C-alpha cells in the first residue's frame, strides 16, 4: 500500500527497537548517516530494552546520544515538524508461573541485570520499566511474552498485534500508559 503521507511506520522488536532509535538520527554512525526520521513518522518498539544496569556499550551510546523520545513532539525545542516522530513503546507483562520453563529460568537474571530486581514484571526477558521509553506512548499488554519460546502469546501473535496496533490508531494525547486486557 502507498502511504498517503509518504512516510512509514517503523517496527522494531527487542534490540531492534533500540537500533531504530539510532536509525532515526541524521548524525553519523560508523561513518554513515541514516536520517530515518525523514522517512518515518512513527516508531513502534516491541519489548525493547531501553535501560539496563548492565547495558551493552551500543545501547548506552544510543541512550546518551538520543535520550528518551528524542524526535517526538514532546521535545521542547525548535525542531521542524518534519523531524518529529511518534514513539510507541509496547511492554509485555507475563505471569511467570504461566510462562514457558525457559522464561521462568531466564527472567530473574534478565530482570536483575536490567532493573536490579529479579522479581520485576516483564515479558520474560525485558522488564516493563526498561521497555517503556521516556516520553513515548506506552502500551502494557498482560500475558504477553518476549518471544514464542517465552510463552504462547508474544508481540507477533496475531491477536497481540491487533492489541498494540490499536494504540497506533488512537490520537496521541501525551505520554500515556495504556494497559490492555488479557490477550486471548
Positions of the model-derived regions?
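Secondary-structure boundary motif
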Residues: 1-4, 29
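Alpha/beta-hydrolase fold nucleophile elbow
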Residues: 3-13
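Gly/Ala-rich beta-loop-alpha elbow adjacent to hydrolase catalytic centers
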Residues: 12, 16, 20, 47
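Helical cap/lid subdomain of alpha/beta-hydrolase-fold lipid enzymes
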Residues: 24-184
Amino acid at each position: 500500500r502507498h502511504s498517503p503521507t509518504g512516510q512509514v511506520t517503523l517496527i522494531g522488536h527487542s534490540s531492534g527497537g533500540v537500533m531504530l532509535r539510532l536509525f532515526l538520527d541524521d548524525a553519523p554512525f560508523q561513518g554513515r548517516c541514516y536520517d530515518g526520521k525523514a522517512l518515518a513518522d512513527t516508531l513502534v518498539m516491541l519489548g525493547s530494552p531501553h535501560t539496563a544496569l548492565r547495558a551493552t556499550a551500543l545501547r548506552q551510546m544510543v541512550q546518551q546520544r538520543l535520550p528518551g523520545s528524542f524526535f517526538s513532539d514532546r521535545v521542547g525545542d525548535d525542531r521542524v515538524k518534519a523531524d518529529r516522530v511518534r514513539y510507541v513503546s509496547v511492554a509485555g507483562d507475563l505471569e511467570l508461573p504461566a510462562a514457558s520453563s525457559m522464561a521462568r529460568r531466564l527472567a530473574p537474571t534478565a530482570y536483575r541485570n536490567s532493573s536490579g530486581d529479579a522479581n520485576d514484571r516483564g515479558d520474560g526477558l525485558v522488564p516493563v520499566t526498561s521497555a517503556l521509553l521516556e516520553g513515548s506512548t506506552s502500551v502494557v499488554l498482560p500475558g504477553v511474552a518476549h518471544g514464542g519460546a517465552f510463552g504462547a502469546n508474544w508481540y507477533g501473535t496475531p491477536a497481540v498485534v491487533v492489541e498494540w496496533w490499536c494504540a497506533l490508531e488512537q490520537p496521541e494525547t501525551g505520554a500515556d500508559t495504556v494497559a490492555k486486557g488479557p490477550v486471548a
